[in-house]
Amino acid sequence: MQQIVLASGNKGKLAEFDQMLAAYGVKVLPQSQFNVSEVAETGTTFVENAIIKARHAAQITGHAAIADDSGLEVDLLQGVPGIYSARYAGENAKDQDNVLKLLDTLKDYPAPRTARFQCVLVYMRHAKDPTPIICQASWEGQIDFVQRGDNGHGYDPIFIPEHHDCSAAQMSSDEKNTLSHRGKALVQLITAMQEKGVFTDRNAQ
């Protein structure tokens, strides 16, 4: 089975990637399995940070790597928290800390509080890959006033997807994989990886 390292320690992301790539005979391994430390995200865009993370993981593990850089953009806040979504409430903030800070920041704003999740995925064959595969997708919606659901991570409990009445954390994993920014970007990435021959015939199901 082909192995690709995910340049993240986020268990929620690992589950999403592993579930969607399993059909292609690919096992997604967390970088923690190789004792890869988190790298400083010094970029000013999602693309830059994803490349930094993928290169770091590939260099240390010797495996091909996928990195995800994603975040939530709130229109009322001019795109904040953006690339700082994971550390919106501080460098060591947990998901709940970030959610509570955003709810507090928006408490005086009425609906609709439009927002979107952005996701950039980068696949690097090796650390010096000069032509990494880069895919981007978004998921439109708005920020709710309360948290709902527990089938998700990050800001999922307060994100109401466009044309839906439930939060992202109230959706089934299959539904979320179809609609979400990460799910859509991963479909793009899988297609691009197939076109470039990353998956061998015996991998594809």
UniProtKB/Swiss-Prot annotation:
A GO cellular-component term linked to this record: cytoplasm
Residues reported to bind substrate: 8-13, 70, 153-156, 176, 181-182
Pfam families: Ham1p_like
One of the protein's GO biological processes: nucleoside triphosphate catabolic process
List of catalytic residues: 69
E.C. no: 3.6.1.66
Cofactor binding annotation: Binds 1 Mg(2+) ion per subunit.
Family: Belongs to the HAM1 NTPase family.
Subunit text: Homodimer.
Protein name: dITP/XTP pyrophosphatase
Organism: Shewanella oneidensis (strain ATCC 700550 / JCM 31522 / CIP 106686 / LMG 19005 / NCIMB 14063 / MR-1)
Lineage: Bacteria, Pseudomonadati, Pseudomonadota, Gammaproteobacteria, Alteromonadales
